Swiss-Prot record:
Region feature Disordered, mapped onto this chain: 597-639
Entry EC no(s): 3.4.24.-
Record-given protein name: ATP-dependent zinc metalloprotease FtsH
Chain positions recorded as ATP binding sites: 196-203
Membrane topology value: Multi-pass membrane protein
Keywords, sorted A to Z: ATP-binding, Cell inner membrane, Cell membrane, Hydrolase, Membrane, Metal-binding, Metalloprotease, Nucleotide-binding, Protease, Transmembrane, Transmembrane helix, Zinc
Length: 639
């Protein structure tokens, strides 16, 4: 019986109970208007001629008196045959009604109040269940079933993570042909843990595995287990695995498993809490699987360091698949997947876009394609152009433009020199990344941005690279001192980042005269998920040496940038003027300014246009005396 039929039957039952209840009350109200008299009084009144008419219904007599036409009723014995003779002799009108109907109707009328109360109770329970309270289903799993009839996701929809797909293809073979592996003594993996940064496609990979294997897919979040009531989490875990076994072979996917799988005993309020009971039940269920159940648990997290060791051991999560950010070839594949539904102009080169987006995750690339489509729609274009994608990339990297933010002329001048200081140091220092764009249009929380993109993906960086970044960060403050003869708060974030970078070089990377040593043991709480303190495991003298080394690194970068900007004052003035005139200059503009060439006149729309990624790759390639650059990993430098 489906839910629609159940609903109809339920409301028909409610209507019948209401009718019964109405008849009971109607009968009670009619009876209350009649005067109840004794049988002897009834006979006496009949013999005296005071009764006008009567109606005989079984063992009851209803009638009216002649005076005032008052109504009465009386119970009469069934074995009193003289009753009709007395009534006829005294000229009383007699009406007899048959009472030979079904006795069930009388029984229903008698029990109708109880039935109505039961119906109301069921109605209230249904209302509570259909609302947010779930009064009787707290212990039920909230997993959503993605059945085989729904839209499938396959490996064709997943790109840029070839290694992860290869790892998961064996899982598909296990689900399709489990007997093939069991004949050779192989054991089907009980769990697969997907580990990687946010936005890399862990959830999409899990759905693709279910789609390729053509099996049911249960999806639930780690936060859906624990509620305010004790024992609910463990009950939901049991119910989840019971559903999985009924639909085997299947996949159970738990997203953000760190919400329920954190290290036990690390809570600030003690070790015996509801989350730990849920984790214990999860451990028992995973360890209790039989080899031929055909239920595989897939979980995803970006914090594997906080998970309980018992959850990660072989026999529970047998495999750990790392899903990282895609490389340049992977980014091109991801862009092709997301661009299938987008009409592209002829000038769009996805390979160039992939080269210009190092460090982007799959979600970032999908967002960029979507923003490009929205940009084209706002301009009433029928196709998405390369300029739309470049604008979308800038929006993803630097934030949306805040053109409505009003800045005074003096604030614009300060921002122009500040960003020019960053750009000149980045363009004339070796070991730096290519500049992409400089703007004094407020974006995000910054009044201006100097943006650069690495030529290739970086996995490790050198000491020379970090020293170059320190010099670039100091460029904004130095430009204010040399050309404006004052300091502003705009350099606050630059100084903070430079200090943090220099301290890491000394205390973590061993890039100082103190040698390859680590100073300051971090104190982390698994419950909080991040460090809350730093244990000082060195002496006062060592602390002074650390401070001296940090200051030495920052001072050296400061002196180098000061000398560079002081020697190139004409270029600084020219770049600041170009920024004040155009608000945004791209890679070609920066190259022409440094080479002493005049910039082309402004376009009618105002502005020098948007830089393409080809420009980014061509700007001031590193040479023996200077290189092209910017801030690390495409991070914008706030003014």
């Amino acid at each position: 019986m489906n839910s629609t039929v159940k609903t109809i039957v339920f409301w028909v039952f409610i209507l019948a109970c209401c009718i019964l209840l109405w008849q009971v009350f109607q009968r009670s109200s009619n009876t209350g208007k009649e005067q109840e008299i004794s049988f002897s009084q009834f006979l006496n009144d009949a013999q005296q001629g005071q009764i006008h008419d009567v109606t005989v219904v079984g063992g009851e007599v209803h009638g009216h008196f002649r005076s005032a036409n008052a109504a009465f009723h009386v119970e009469v014995p069934t074995n009193y045959p003289q009753l009709y003779d007395i009534l006829n002799k005294n000229h009383v009108a007699v009406t007899v009604k048959d009472n030979s109907g079904s006795p069930w109707w009388s029984i229903l009328i008698q029990f109708s109040p109880v039935l109505v109360l039961v119906a109301l109770w069921f109605f209230m329970i249904r209302q509570m269940q259909s609302g947010g309270n779930k009064a009787l289903s707290f212990g039920k799993s909230r997993a959503r079933l993605l059945s085989m009839q729904q839209k499938k996701v396959t490996f064709k929809d997943v790109a840029g993570v070839d290694e992860a797909k290869e790892e998961l293809k064996e899982i598909i073979e296990f689900l399709r042909e489990a007997q093939k592996f069991q004949k050779l003594g192989g054991r089907i993996p009980k769990g697969v843990l997907l580990v990687g940064p946010p936005g890399t496609g862990k959830t999409l990979l899990a759905r693709a595995v279910a789609g390729e294997a053509n099996v049911p897919f249960f999806s639930i979040s780690g936060s859906d287990f624990v509620e305010m009531f004790v024992g609910v989490g463990a009950s939901r875990v049991r119910d989840l695995f019971e559903q999985g076994k009924k639909n085997a072979p299947c996949i159970i996917f738990i997203d953000e498993i760190d919400a329920v799988g954190r290290h036990r005993g690390a809570g600030l309020g003690g070790g015996h809490d509801e989350r730990e009971q849920t984790l214990n039940q999860l451990l028992v269920e995973m360890d209790g699987f039989e080899a031929n159940d055909g239920v595989i648990l897939v979980a995803a997290t970006n914090r594997p360091d906080v998970l309980d060791p018992a959850l990660l051991r072989p026999g529970r999560f047998d495999r750990r698949v790392v899903v990282g950010r895609p490389d340049v070839r992977g980014r091109e594949e991801v862009l092709r997947v997301h661009a299938k539904k987008v009409p592209l102009a002829e000038d769009v080169d996805l390979r160039v876009l992939a080269r210009g987006t190092p460090g982007f995750s799959g979600a970032d690339l999908a967002n960029m394609v979507n923003e490009g489509a929205l940009s084209a729609a706002r301009a009433n274009r029928k196709v998405v152009t390369m300029q739309d994608f470049e604008s979308a990339k800038d929006k993803v990297l630097m934030g949306a433009e805040r053109k409505s933010m009003l800045l005074t002329d003096e604030e614009k001048r300060v921002t122009a020199y500040h960003e020019s200081g960053h750009a000149i140091v980045a363009a004339m220092r070796k070991h730096a990344d290519p500049l992409h764009k400089v703007t004094i249009i407020p974006r995000g929380m910054a009044l201006g941005v100097t943006m650069q993109l690495p030529e290739e993906d970086k996995h490790t960086v050198t000491k020379d690279y970090l020293e170059t970044q320190l010099a670039i960060l100091m460029g904004g403050r130095i430009a204010e001192e040399i050309f404006l003869h004052q300091m502003t708060t705009g350099a606050g974030n630059d100084i903070e980042r430079a200090t943090e970078m220099a301290r890491k070089m000394v205390c973590e990377y061993g890039m100082s005269r103190l040698g390859p040593l680590t100073y300051g043991k971090k104190e982390e709480q698994i419950f909080l998920g991040r460090e809350i303190a730093q244990h000082r495991d060195f002496s006062e003298e060592t602390a002074r040496q650390i401070d001296a080394e940090v200051r030495s690194l920052v001072d050296e970068a400061y002196r180098a940038s000061y000398q560079l900007l002081n020697d190139n004052q004409p270029i600084m003035h020219k770049m600041a003027a170009a920024l004040l005139e155009r608000e945004t200059i791209d890679a070609n503009d920066i190259r022409m300014i440094i080479e002493g060439k005049d910039l082309p006149p402004l376009k009618p729309s105002g502005g020098s246009g948007t830089a393409t990624t080809d420009d980014v790759q061509q700007v001031l390639k590193p040479s023996s005396d200077r290189g092209a650059g910017g801030l690390p990993e495409g991070s914008p430098s706030p003014a």
